[in-house]
Amino acid sequence: PFFLFLSFLEPHFQNCFDDFPAPDIYKNIPAGYMPPDLGSLKGTAWEHLSGYYGMVKRLDEALGRIRDALKSLGMEENTILVFSTDHGCHFKTRNKEYKRSCHESSIRIPLAFYGGPFTGAGKLREKVSLVDLAPTLLDACGIPVPADMQGRSIMPWVRRETTTPSGKDIFVQISESQVGRAIRTDRWKYSVEALDKDPIQDAGSPEYTETFLYDLEHDPYELHNLIHSKAHEKVCEVLAEKLKRCMTEAGEPAPVIHPASKENMGQLLVFEGEENL
């Protein structure tokens, strides 16, 4: 048995030119179409999306070469392939960089399995976190999952042993652009930030301030921040407690979470596409 982890440079921009040709079926799309969450906000998507699609095409070609190699070695039938990534890209629409925010374009990522027990085509309607990958692969290989391992196996849903959604919430930790934490439920996105901490030097904080609340059911593109809405104060209270539980389960101390205030309102709202922080 073997375990091989391959990380590709694409779709990072390794030079200053968008010289990756987009796939034929995509290359004309940016001229007349832009995903609503990107097109509604300021950013660099109109300039870079075509080249980004071209780099995604390179990844697809690289995955094809891996499959060809497994076939030539006679190993494809006994190998599980997993395709995923660590984050998405929001093209400077949410902050002054391309990632590291609580928004779907940054945290919602592809995850595909092929081979072994992952037979047939299908889509799993279950929220999955990257910490679920290790227990899932162990379970798929018939190896007992250690009781103290973070995450949970999704194999019961893959094997159709259950079809009931777990109701699990996704916990997000953000660094380098901010000392931030967030939680994503089926309907809500709730994010907090340690406004006085250095995101390069500080890994966490005993205190955070609310920054974002999105109703994903009615606002899937996250264009309306409800964090200052009086009508949603109870929602914030419930989500704050859920977030604290996620943090303690991850080994962090339970923090104090301060409500978003009028004093820092300008600081909190600039993320809706503004580039001057």
Task: Set out the residue ranges of the language-model regions.
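Active-site-proximal cap/lid insertion segments
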Residues: 1-130, 140-148, 199, 204-207, ...
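Short, solvent-exposed loop/turn segments at secondary-structure junctions
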Residues: 8-13, 87-90, 97, 118-119, ...
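Polar, surface-exposed loop/tail segments
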Residues: 77-79, 121-183, 232, 237, ...
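C-terminal helix-rich "cap/oligomerization" subdomain common to oxidoreductases
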Residues: 239, 243-257, 266-272
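Non-transmembrane alpha-helical segments in soluble domains
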Residues: 53-56, 60-71, 134-138, 142, ...
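Protein kinase-like catalytic core scaffold
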Residues: 2-4, 80, 170, 189, ...
